[in-house]
């Protein structure tokens, strides 16, 4: 694993001639700990917020293909490693990609930067049912589309009609539900696509029923999840026949702590930053839990939290099955 020094000012100066027509904001050396809900992570070499979809398309057309690109949302399900992220990190702004437009009695056109909870609220006002579960998902639509986010027995795949995206060449794509190849907490699409919006469909409902369903979702989160901590949400995907938290608990990992990172006492499938955790602490804790669960019950936990960026030199976390 080669460590690449982060020098955003140098990269920006080198790219400046091809970026002259870009209207969005490009910032060198952005601290990713200010972006992620874990409040950890190294520097993004360049941090780009496109002005609109045309600006993003142009950016892709002029950016040399060998410059790495990483897409981030609102940072809720994201662990950024301490060595930072080489190349360009792209984050869609809510101003340009956060629209919610009702296009029929049961359909919304929704920007990828829209907060999931705002979509739930819009559906309540429009009396469209089937979106209440987004009230309990601490993320944005782009991440929900990619991860097939769900709660309370409902998944994003059940609401998707079309998804709109751009590729690394700046070409536009429209993907239908079949194209998304959805599975549990996953979609299988071509590498490099960036979601910009989606057409979603619910059902005709009424405010009282929708409000009651949203209240139930909120009450559940409040009761069983450490929502006031610095956390990234569910750490591992549930297994086919058993919840991840159960095998974690049975392996004795509830409350397990490494450095400033801890498996929550309240919900042991949630990692929390106790105050000064590093990305290394969090990822080391996660891999330690995976190893202990495997040793205890032979269950193989898969990460649900997205881990991106590079490790600091001499502070590398190997997947547990490489040191098991």
UniProtKB/Swiss-Prot annotation:
Pathway: Cell wall biogenesis; peptidoglycan biosynthesis
PROSITE patterns named in the record: FAD_PCMH
Pfam families: FAD_binding_4 (PF01565), MurB_C (PF02873)
Keywords of the record: Cell cycle, Cell division, Cell shape, Cell wall biogenesis/degradation, Cytoplasm, FAD, Flavoprotein, NADP, Oxidoreductase, Peptidoglycan synthesis
Cofactor needs: FAD
Protein name (record): UDP-N-acetylenolpyruvoylglucosamine reductase
An annotated GO BP: cell wall organization
Record-linked Gene3D superfamilies: 3.30.465.10, UDP-N-acetylenolpyruvoylglucosamine reductase, C-terminal domain (3.90.78.10), Uridine Diphospho-n-acetylenolpyruvylglucosamine Reductase, domain 2 (3.30.43.10)
Organism: Bartonella bacilliformis (strain ATCC 35685 / KC583 / Herrer 020/F12,63)
Keyword Oxidoreductase included in the entry's annotation: yes
């Amino acid at each position: 694993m080669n460590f690449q020094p982060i020098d955003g000012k140098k990269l920006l100066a080198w790219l400046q001639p091809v970026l002259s027509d870009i209207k969005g904001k490009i910032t060198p050396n952005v601290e990713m700990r200010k972006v992620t809900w874990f409040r950890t992570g190294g520097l993004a070499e360049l941090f780009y917020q496109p002005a609109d979809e045309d600006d993003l398309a142009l950016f892709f057309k002029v950016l040399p293909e060998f410059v790495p690109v990483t897409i981030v949302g609102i940072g809720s399900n994201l662990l950024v490693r301490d060595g930072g992220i080489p190349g360009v990190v792209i984050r869609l702004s809510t101003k340009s990609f956060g629209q919610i437009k009702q296009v029929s009695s049961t359909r919304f056109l929704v920007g990828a930067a829209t907060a999931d909870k705002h979509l739930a609220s819009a559906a309540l006002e429009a009396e469209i049912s089937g979106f209440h579960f987004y009230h309990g998902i601490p993320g944005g639509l782009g991440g929900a589309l990619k991860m097939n986010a769900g709660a309370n027995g409902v998944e994003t795949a059940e609401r998707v009609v079309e998804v709109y995206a751009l590729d690394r060449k700046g070409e536009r794509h429209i993907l239908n539900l079949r194209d998304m190849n959805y599975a549990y907490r996953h979609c299988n699409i071509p590498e490099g696509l960036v979601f910009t919006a989606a057409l979603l469909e619910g059902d005709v409902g009424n405010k009282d029923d929708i409000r009651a369903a949203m209240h139930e979702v909120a009450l559940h989160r409040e009761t069983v999840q450490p929502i006031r901590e610095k956390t990234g949400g569910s750490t591992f995907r549930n297994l086919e026949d058993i919840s991840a938290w159960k095998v974690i608990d049975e392996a004795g990992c509830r409350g397990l702590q490494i450095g400033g990172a801890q498996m929550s006492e309240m919900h042991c499938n949630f990692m929390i930053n106790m105050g000064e955790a590093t990305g290394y602490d969090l990822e080391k804790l996660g891999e330690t839990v995976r190893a202990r669960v495997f040793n205890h019950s032979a269950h193989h936990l898969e990460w649900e939290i997205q881990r991106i960026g590079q490790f600091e030199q001499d502070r590398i976390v190997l997947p547990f099955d490489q040191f098991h």
